[in-house]
């Protein structure tokens, strides 16, 4: 496992911003990233965020979003060391309340209305329809490592989805197509005294905006197409493109969005399992999540 170089990263960032010392306070830390509040001798504060691949280009996405007019925290300085990104960012302070559905659609309308930017990876129809095949490749590598041996049902489900993917991925580039936040949840929207800011751009890409809208209510509870339909209608009312309600891939917009969002999550979980986390001890939790999502995908995409 790569040693976390956060102390050295912070030293580099302090030098870059003309600071000499800072007191660190953990906000949230996990194996691949961390967020801390740092206090400087003059009483000012900043947010120190560090992350390893594949989360190591968030500074570029945040600066790009800021340039294009999306309300995001300002990046004061960033540095990369041994495959880890470190950022010193504006401290937004405490939130005054939790973000609600109307806050979410307002933020999505602004983000999705932003012109797309070349540095962002692209998830178009060709890329979308390969997600089940990519997940099968991850499964093959896991099994070669003598892991996921009792997951024939996962392979069978992915095979079925792969066969239907060409037809079901149709309409991927219908509007809204552009900036996708990809971690679009109420916790990613900070409502402060000076308005809102969108956080956590580490996995932003260019693709179907419906994936953002379908992620807002999370993946812990079973997917709820009727609730998403209401949310899509709120999005259109708030100024989002009416095409957000248009059928695609032979499905309603809400079924298409929820189904492909879950398939996108499955491929990401499996890539984490073999490539980024790569810890057999986590396999039972990953397999459980993948099975649950694949059941939803088969139902939502009517396969």
Which role does the model predict for each range below?
Residues 15-22, 57-58, 144-145, 161-173:
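Short Pro/Gly-enriched beta-strand edge/turn motifs at strand-loop
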Residues 81-99, 136-147, 263-284:
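A glycine-centered beta->alpha junction motif in the catalytic cores
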Residues 28-40, 166-211:
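Active-site acidic catalytic loop and adjacent metal/ATP-binding pocket
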Residues 27, 32-127:
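ATP-binding pocket architecture of kinase catalytic cores
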Residues 291-303:
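Membrane-interface aromatic/basic loop that binds lipid-linked glycans or pyrophosphate carriers
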Residues 210-243, 259-282, 293-296:
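Active-site activation/catalytic loop segments of kinase-like enzymes and analogous catalytic loops
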Residues 1-25:
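Juxta-kinase regulatory segment immediately upstream of eukaryotic protein kinase catalytic domains
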Residues 95-157, 175-177, 205-206, 288:
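A cross-family kinase active-site recognition segment
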């Amino acid at each position: 496992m790569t040693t976390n170089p956060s102390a050295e990263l912070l030293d580099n960032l302090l030098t870059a911003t003309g600071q000499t010392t800072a007191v660190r306070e953990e906000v949230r830390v996990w194996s691949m990233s961390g967020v801390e509040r740092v206090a400087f001798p003059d009483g000012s504060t900043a947010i120190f965020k560090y992350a390893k691949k594949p989360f190591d280009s968030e500074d570029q996405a945040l600066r790009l979003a800021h340039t294009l007019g999306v309300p995001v925290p300002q990046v004061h300085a960033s540095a990369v060391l041994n495959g880890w990104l470190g950022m010193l960012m504006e401290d937004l302070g405490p939130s005054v309340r939790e973000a609600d559905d109307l806050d979410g659609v307002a933020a999505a309308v602004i983000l999705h209305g932003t012109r797309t930017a070349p540095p962002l990876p692209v998830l178009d129809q060709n890329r979308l329809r390969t997600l089940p095949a990519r997940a099968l490749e991850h499964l093959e590598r896991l099994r070669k490592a003598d892991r996921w041996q009792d997951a024939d049902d996962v392979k069978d489900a992915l095979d079925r989805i792969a066969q239907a993917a060409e037809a079901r991925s149709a309409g991927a580039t219908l509007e809204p197509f552009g900036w996708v936040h990809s971690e679009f949840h109420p916790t990613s929207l900070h409502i402060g005294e000076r308005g809102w800011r969108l956080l956590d751009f580490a996995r932003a890409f260019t693709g179907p905006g419906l994936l953002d809208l379908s992620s807002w209510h999370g993946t812990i509870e079973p997917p709820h197409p009727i609730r998403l339909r209401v949310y899509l209608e709120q999005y259109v009312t708030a100024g989002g493109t009416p095409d957000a309600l248009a059928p695609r891939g032979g499905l309603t917009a809400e079924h298409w969005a929820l189904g492909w969002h879950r398939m996108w999550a499955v491929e990401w979980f499996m890539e984490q399992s073999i490539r980024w986390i790569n810890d057999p001890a986590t396999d039972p939790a990953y397999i459980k999540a993948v099975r649950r999502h694949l059941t939803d995908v088969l139902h939502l995409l009517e396969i």
